[in-house]
From Swiss-Prot:
Other remarks in the entry: Carbon 2 of the heme B porphyrin ring is defined according to the Fischer nomenclature.
Catalytic reaction list: heme b + (2E,6E)-farnesyl diphosphate + H2O = Fe(II)-heme o + diphosphate
Pathway info: Porphyrin-containing compound metabolism; heme O biosynthesis; heme O from protoheme: step 1/1
Native species: Thermoplasma acidophilum (strain ATCC 25905 / DSM 1728 / JCM 9062 / NBRC 15155 / AMRC-C165)
Gene expressing this chain: ctaB
Keyword Transmembrane helix part of the UniProt annotation: yes
Pfam families: UbiA (PF01040)
Protein name per the record: Protoheme IX farnesyltransferase
Membrane topology note: Multi-pass membrane protein
Transmembrane residue ranges: 16-36, 37-57, 88-108, 111-131, 138-158, 162-182, 210-230, 236-256, 265-285
PANTHER family associated with the record: PROTOHEME IX FARNESYLTRANSFERASE, MITOCHONDRIAL
Keywords: Cell membrane, Heme biosynthesis, Membrane, Transferase, Transmembrane, Transmembrane helix
């Protein structure tokens, strides 16, 4: 891969969208009744579409946020800020990728998946980044729905049959996003204050922020075991999911008792693998 291609690839923030592509692929796999070449090709289609959409959304929001990125220490080295990529080129790159993500699904007749892709992109780019990020601390709640759509897109790329399972997973990701974003935002609250972005952690004191973040962690745990109560996952899944949640709940309690950046970072670091592990458990028990 050339240095220019690598630059544009890094511009899409692969560390951000890689987990979304993962849950999108899981959403496709759990929808198949058995493995054959046809279903494998649909899994690949879903994965490519989610990757294109996620890359496009991140590239476009980079354009929208370029003035914010310029004053935040965590983001001031991004390509639009440093001038490595011209703003118009960055915007067009993002728009083309988003268009391709919808077009490729529509071209293969996956209209439900294309519709959900469009809704997810609209929520991420317009509702979150353009409309609410600079105006309300509810920004990540209103814009968090976009993070749940990859699993639904994966499911409806494979089948048009309704199931409650992908929507449970959709809600799980939506609930996961606040704890993941807020625990990181707490660490960089000075950056958000400097950029005048009203994140929940930048407008409330340490204790309230810690309570909100830790409450989100408890809600995430509750949502992760709900599928067992609706009999779409076995009880052994609930037991394992509960065991995996113990460190997260522990870190949440510690964070409330001692709200500081060190403890918020511990919660942030654990939240990413937690979601991935839950999805792996769902995948395993789907086929057992």
């Amino acid at each position: 891969m050339t240095s220019k291609a690598m630059l544009y690839f890094s511009y899409t923030k692969p560390k951000v969208w890689s987990l979304l592509v993962f849950v999108g692929a899981i959403g496709a796999v759990i929808a198949i009744p058995y493995f054959n070449l046809h279903y494998i090709s649909l899994i690949v289609l879903a994965t490519i579409a989610v990757m294109l959409g996620s890359m496009g959304a991140e590239a476009t929001t980079n354009y929208i946020d370029k003035d914010i990125d310029a004053v935040m220490s965590r983001t001031m080295k991004r390509p639009l800020v440093t001038g490595q990529i011209k703003p118009i080129n960055g915007l067009l790159f993002g728009l083309v990728l988003m268009f391709l993500s919808i077009a490729i699904l529509a071209a293969f007749g996956k209209l439900y998946a294309a519709l959900f892709m469009g809704i997810g992109l609209f929520d991420n780019v317009f509702i979150y980044s353009y409309l609410t990020k600079r105006r309300t601390p509810w920004n990540i709640i209103l814009g968090g729905f976009s993070g749940g759509f990859p699993v639904v897109i994966g499911w409806y790329t494979v089948t048009s049959k309704f199931s409650i399972l992908p929507w449970f997973l959709f809600l799980l990701v939506v609930v996961w996003i606040p704890i993941h974003v807020w625990s990181l935002a707490y660490r960089y609250r000075d950056d958000y204050n400097r950029a005048h972005v009203p994140m929940m952690t930048s407008i409330h004191n340490d204790r309230i922020s810690a309570i909100c973040i830790s409450s989100a962690a408890i809600i995430l745990f509750a949502f992760s075991i709900i599928p067992a109560f609706f009999r779409v996952m076995p009880m052994v899944y609930m037991i394992l999911a509960s065991a995996i949640a113990v460190p997260m709940i522990f870190y949440s309690i510690v964070f409330v008792r001692h709200p500081d950046r060190k403890n918020s970072l511990k919660l942030f670091i654990y939240s990413s693998p937690y979601l991935a592990i839950i999805f792996v458990l769902v995948l395993i028990f789907r086929f057992l």
